[in-house]
Amino acid sequence: FGKYFDDRGVVLQTENEGVAHFAQKLYRRCGVQGTVISKERPTGPVYEFSVKDPDEVAKMLALFGHTGKEPTLRIRPENFKCQNCMQAFIATAFLCCGTMTDPEKSYNLEFLSTRHYLSQQLEAMLAEHNFHPHRALRKGANTIYIKAADHIEDLLTFMGAGGAAMRIMDQRMYNEMR
């Protein structure tokens, strides 16, 4: 769900410097070296973790069971050894391409991707865990979204963001009491 993942390497962009350095740390644990750089944008800095060195790219592709020449990128279920792997994958996908509205205004969590098959597979993974996702095409991007507050709370908890789930629960109770 990054900017790209192919024989050129991988690029993950985020507004959170800690997320970029965490990606670097995880790849390093797997034996793949990458770099983090900061790019200034009018809206603020964007941090980019990348693996571009050809030797490191080869290691990365082998690690994930890809050649880098696939016509369409797919999620490979065999890469998930346990439930924690699935949870970490979905959480990382959210960090790469997810957004969530302010719960004071509405309840909406989205994953956006230009990759059609990848989006379909993510939707299926979320449905398999009863998060009740929906899919739409918006401005050329595949959007997987969840609108029900209770499903958003469950997904956030599943991804390890229990504090964010509790804030939504608190806001929902506040809204219901008004």
Task: List each language-model region with its residue ranges.
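Short beta-strand
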Residues: V36-R41, H134-R138
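Intein-associated homing endonuclease modules of the LAGLIDADG/DOD-type, together
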Residues: F1-Q33, I37-K39, T72-H129
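Helix N-cap motif at beta-to-alpha junctions
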Residues: N16-E17, K52-E56, R115-Y117, A148-E153
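Structural preference for solvent-exposed beta-strand-turn elements
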Residues: V57, L61-L63, P103
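A generic structural motif
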Residues: P42-E56, G140-A149
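A short alpha->loop->secondary-structure connector
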Residues: G65-P71, N130-F131
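Extended mid-to-C-terminal alpha-helical interaction segments
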Residues: G160-R178
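Charge-rich, low-aromatic oligomerization/scaffolding segments with amphipathic character
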Residues: K59-L61, E153-G162
